[in-house]
Amino acid sequence: MSKHSLKQSVRTFFYYSNMRLILLCLAASVYGCLLVYSAARSADNGMSGVIMQIGASIVGLILAMLISQVDYEDICRLWPVWSAIAVGLVLLTFTPLGLNVAGTDDTAWLGVRIGSFRLTFQPAELMKITFIITFAVHLSRVQQDIRRFKTLVLLALHAMIPIGLVFLQGDDGTALVFIMIFLSMLLVSGVNLLYYVLGLAGVCALVPLAWTYLLTDDKKARFLCILPPYIEKYLGTTGWQQYEGLKAIGSGQLTGLGYLKGGNGFSFARNNDLIF
C-alpha cells in the first residue's frame, strides 16, 4: 500500500467514524491509566503496570478501530475459529504453562517474559468476547424457536462450556460473569419469562442443599464474612478483601480522598482490587 493510499484510508476512516465514541474511548483509556498510576505508584514494580496499561490501551484502541472496519457478519462466520482459539488458550492453563498471580489461588493465567517485563494474560477474558459472538450466532439461528424448552436446553449447554472451564480453573467470580452474560443475552432475545421465574424458584430451593453438601468451608466463609458475628473471625483471611473494601469506601465515601491521596498499600493487586 502506497503512502498516499494509506493516508487516504485513514482520512476515510475518521470521516465515516463516530468521532464522539472514539473520543469517549480515548478519554476512558487515559482516565484508566491515571487511576492505575494512582493506585500502583508506590507498589514494587508499580510503574511496570502503568506502562503495560498504557501500551494495552494504545493497542486496544488501534485494534478496535481496525476491527470496526470488518463486517460483523464476516466475524460471525468465523465463530468456530474464535471458539477454538479461546478454548484452546483456556485449556493451556491446565498444563504446566498455567500460572497463578499474587493474591490468587486459581491457575487461570498464561505468561510471557519480554526483557524485564513479565506479561500475564487471562484467557477467560478473551473467551468472554468469543462467547458473546458464538452465543449471538446461536441465538440468531434459533430465534424462531426461542420459546421452546428444547431450544433453551441447547442454549444452556452452549453456555456450560465456558462456565464449566472457568469453574474448573477455580475462578468462581469470572464464572459468575459468564452466567450473567448468558442470562442477559437470553432475556433480550425474547425467552419466555416463565423460565426465569421457574429458574429462580429452583435456585432458591437448591440453596439449602448446596450450602449443606456442595460448598466448602472456604466458600461458605465468603458469604459469612460480611455478617457482624463473623467479621472479626475472618478478618485476616477470607474476609480481608471485603474489610479493605469497606475501609476504602468508608474513608473516601462518595467523593473519594482525592487523586494521589489514597493511603492503602496492603492489597496484592492494588491497581486492580482497590483502584477506587
Where are these regions (language model features)?
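Membrane-helix boundary/helix-loop-helix interface segments in multi-pass membrane proteins
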Residues: 2-23, 28, 34-169
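Short loop segments and helix-boundary regions at transmembrane helix junctions
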Residues: 187-196
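Hydrophobic transmembrane alpha-helices of multi-pass, membrane-embedded glycosylation machinery
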Residues: 175-187, 201-205, 223
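Interfacial helix-loop-helix junctions of multi-pass membrane proteins
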Residues: 168, 172-176
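Hydrophobic, glycine- and aromatic-enriched re-entrant/interface helices and adjoining loop segments
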Residues: 101-113, 117-120, 198-276
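Interfacial segments of alpha-helical transmembrane regions
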Residues: 79-83, 195-204
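Short amphipathic alpha-helical coupling elements at transmembrane boundaries
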Residues: 141-144, 151, 181, 185, ...
